Every structure is written in structure tokens, then in C-alpha cells.
A protein has these predicted regions:
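Helix-start (N-cap) detector for alpha-helical repeat units in TPR-like alpha-solenoids
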Residues: 57-58, 91-92, 125-126, 170-172, ...
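Structural signature of tandem alpha-helical TPR/SEL1-like repeats
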Residues: 71-82, 103-116, 140-161, 191-204, ...
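Canonical tetratricopeptide repeat
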Residues: 62, 96, 130, 177, ...
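Short coil turns that delineate tetratricopeptide repeat
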Residues: 54, 88, 122, 167, ...
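Alpha-helical segment of the N-proximal tetratricopeptide repeat
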Residues: 55-86, 103, 180, 184-192
Length: 399
């Protein structure tokens, strides 16, 4: 994104509408009238142009929060940056700017912004949590994770500082603040591969804040990642009960039900999640996944196609299931394309790489088999999971 120089009148036209929903801007200086040079009633002199008072940083922060809440992160970034230029010591401006930069995948600038915030306002708990999240997102988004391996240790260090701040917060807020720290710590531990410690962190967060759907989602996700499907379903069911309008929780709950074999219960839950948030790619895509697992390829393809249209990069799983649909239909060209996208965006999943290999092993019509590429992908899958029987059988076939 190009750097923009922002003056105090930036987005003035937008402010008049958007700030009306947040807070009113200060009144402009009254217009002054220049008296006529000589009596001429038929030709009054035009009024002088009014002087517009500069808008304070707080107005831009309010505008940024308005846009951020609507998911308009580009516009939020512009507003928060204007606020930070007007008042470089505004913690609210720096926090909003850093969070917006993370959403726009500007990870290095986000870390710099949030470090500045936590340096000048060391007791800002939200700033510490946002900085820990920025370190994680830079790690997740890195093409070469070896270059950012220190990020997770830095995130844990920031969270240690955040925990001290949370412990010192007023008693009425302490449990809530500590739950945020432990939830974030669980996220970092998950990225480090410390599954058991991550589960304990999420459990501790949930004990502190038992009615928080996000924490229950994260706990259920870790249970699923470690093979405890029953506990995962229980945690997601609690999340849905806690917040019935949350499409993410309901969509994931539906997927876990389908994986357990209970597709009859899963399908209506998935459909409800997509109805709750028709523009949410996760909810729409998981309806597609559940439909695939329920042997409804028509609905599956429609929902998965819509999901990747809504967000082409965030959910490689949906390309994987589109590839599976293509394989089932014998469309090898489309299968290879979708499975290649899935693997490119999420290349640590052995199952996806195996099915990419299978698409190259097969041939149909003008699409010839490519045994060399099939072998390469089977070998990659086995490196990730040496006990993956399907990949071993595939490798035996193409040798």
C-alpha cells in the first residue's frame, strides 16, 4: 500500500455522515461577511470563505472505529493514521492504526506501531494484546517461517507483561482481562506445536470467562486438533448455546457434527450459520464442507464457490473440498487447479497433498497422467505424516 500524506481535512465529506453515527465534530468557525466597499444595494459583496478549524484526533479515532467495526479496514487505516499524525501520543490512534495494519497484512509496520504504543503507554493492556497478535499474524503469514521463528517467543514475552497488567487491574475487570491473556497465550502455544499446554491455557481462560464463545471455539478447535472429537463437539455446542447468533461457532459445530457422522444434525446447523452471515466466507464455506460430507455435491459446490469468491486467500480448506468435488466428477483439470491452490495456501496438510498427487496419478480424456508429479506429492505427504497409509499405497503404485 502506498504511503499517504494526510492533512487535517482528510475525508471531510465522509466525516459529516460517518461521525454522525459516532460523535459530532466540533463546529466550524462562523463565516464572516465582508462589508461592501461602497453603497450598492443591488450588488452585495460575496461573503469571505469560512475558516475550517482542524479536526481533533479523537474525531478521526471515532471514524476509524466506525470503519473498523464495519470491516472497512482500508478506510479505518486512513482515519487512524490521520489521528496519529495529528496526535502522535494518542494511544487510541496508535492502537487502531496497529490493528488496521494487521488486518491489511502490513505486519512489520503494525509491530512498529504497537511497540511505540506499549513503549509510551506501558500500562495499556489492549496494546500488549494487539502486539502479541501482530507477532502471531506475521508468523502465520510468512512465506519462510524460519525467518520469523523469534516472533512466538516475543509474543509470549509481551503476554507475560500483559498478565502482570491484568493482575493489577481493578477486581471487577481482573477475570475478564486475565481470560484475554490466557486465550492469546493458548493461540501462541498452538502455533508452537505445544498442544497440551495450549489446551490448558484455553481451559484456564474459559474458567475465568465461562460464557465467552470465542474461548470455547478455540478450546474445541484444540480438542479436535488432538483427536478428541467428543470434547471438541461439546465445547462448540457450549459456544453455540452461549452465543446463538455467532455464525463462526455454529458453522464449526456443524462441521464437527458432520465429521462425527451425524450429518442429519449437521446440515441444518450449517445452513443456519450461512443464513446468519451470508457474506461470511467461513460460514458459507463450512456449509459447503458439511454438504460435501452429507453427499450433497450440488449445494457443496455452490457454497464453496461462493466462499472462495468472498475471500480467495483465507480458507484453503475450501479449495481442497472443491478439488475433491472435481475429482469425484472426473474433472481432473479443475481438480488439479483447486488442489494446487489448497496446497499452496496450506501446504502442511498431508491429506491435501495426497489428493493432489492422486489427481496427477489419474488421467481422463485429454488430461494425461503425470506419474512424476504424483510421486513427488505422495513423497511430500509422507514426509509430513510417515504413517499416512493412502500416501504410501499411492507411492507404491507410481514407482
Amino acid at each position: 500500500m502506498k504511503r499517504r500524506t494526510l492533512g487535517p481535512l482528510l475525508a471531510a465529506a465522509t466525516l459529516s455522515a460517518a461521525l454522525a453515527q459516532t460523535q459530532a465534530p466540533p463546529a466550524s468557525a462562523p463565516a464572516t461577511q465582508t462589508p461592501p466597499a461602497a453603497p450598492a444595494p443591488a450588488q452585495p459583496a460575496a461573503p469571505a470563505a469560512p475558516r475550517t478549524a482542524p479536526l481533533p484526533a479523537a474525531n478521526y479515532v471515532a471514524l476509524g472505529n466506525f470503519y473498523y467495526g464495519r470491516g472497512n479496514f482500508d478506510q479505518a487505516y486512513v482515519a487512524f493514521r490521520a489521528a496519529a499524525e495529528i496526535d502522535a501520543r494518542s494511544s487510541d490512534a496508535l492502537l487502531g492504526l496497529g490493528r488496521s495494519q494487521v488486518k491489511l497484512r502490513l505486519y512489520a509496520p503494525a509491530i512498529e506501531t504497537l511497540r511505540r504504543l506499549t513503549t509510551q503507554d506501558p500500562r495499556n493492556l489492549s496494546g500488549h494484546l494487539a502486539l502479541a497478535q501482530a507477532y502471531q499474524q506475521q508468523f502465520i503469514g510468512a512465506g519462510d517461517r524460519a525467518s520469523v521463528t523469534g516472533n512466538l517467543a516475543q509474543a509470549l514475552g509481551v503476554l507475560t507483561q500483559a498478565e502482570a497488567l491484568a493482575q493489577a487491574s481493578p477486581e471487577a475487570e481482573r477475570k475478564l482481562n486475565l481470560s484475554k491473556v490466557w486465550n492469546e497465550r493458548g493461540n501462541v502455544l498452538r502455533l508452537q506445536g505445544a498442544a497440551g499446554q495450549a489446551i490448558e491455557a484455553f481451559k484456564r481462560a474459559s474458567t475465568l470467562n465461562p460464557d465467552n464463545g470465542l474461548i470455547l471455539f478455540n478450546l474445541g478447535d484444540m480438542y479436535y486438533a488432538t483427536g478428541n472429537l467428543v470434547a471438541a463437539i461439546d465445547s462448540l455446542q457450549r459456544a453455540v448455546i452461549t452465543d446463538p447468533a455467532d455464525a463462526y461457532n455454529r458453522a464449526y459445530y456443524a462441521k464437527l457434527l458432520a465429521i462425527s457422522g451425524n450429518t442429519a444434525a449437521a446440515k441444518p446447523e450449517a445452513a443456519q450459520a450461512a443464513r446468519l452471515a451470508p457474506n461470511n466466507p467461513y460460514a458459507v464455506g463450512q456449509y459447503g464442507v458439511v454438504s460435501y460430507l452429507s453427499r450433497d455435491p450440488v449445494t457443496a459446490r455452490a457454497q464453496l464457490t461462493q466462499a472462495v469468491r468472498l475471500d480467495p486467500l483465507r480458507y484453503p480448506e475450501f479449495y481442497y473440498f472443491l478439488g475433491r468435488l472435481d475429482l469425484d466428477a472426473g474433472d481432473l483439470k479443475a481438480a488439479r487447479e483447486n488442489l494446487t491452490r489448497a496446497v499452496a495456501l496450506g501446504s502442511t496438510t498431508a491429506e491435501w497433498i495426497y489428493y493432489l498427487g492422486l489427481s496427477y496419478e489419474r488421467g481422463a480424456g485429454a488430461i494425461a497422467p503425470d506419474r512424476l508429479k504424483a510421486r513427488e506429492n505422495y513423497e511430500r505427504a509422507l514426509k509430513l505424516n510417515p504413517d499416512y497409509a493412502l500416501a504410501r499405497e499411492g507411492l507404491t503404485r507410481v514407482r
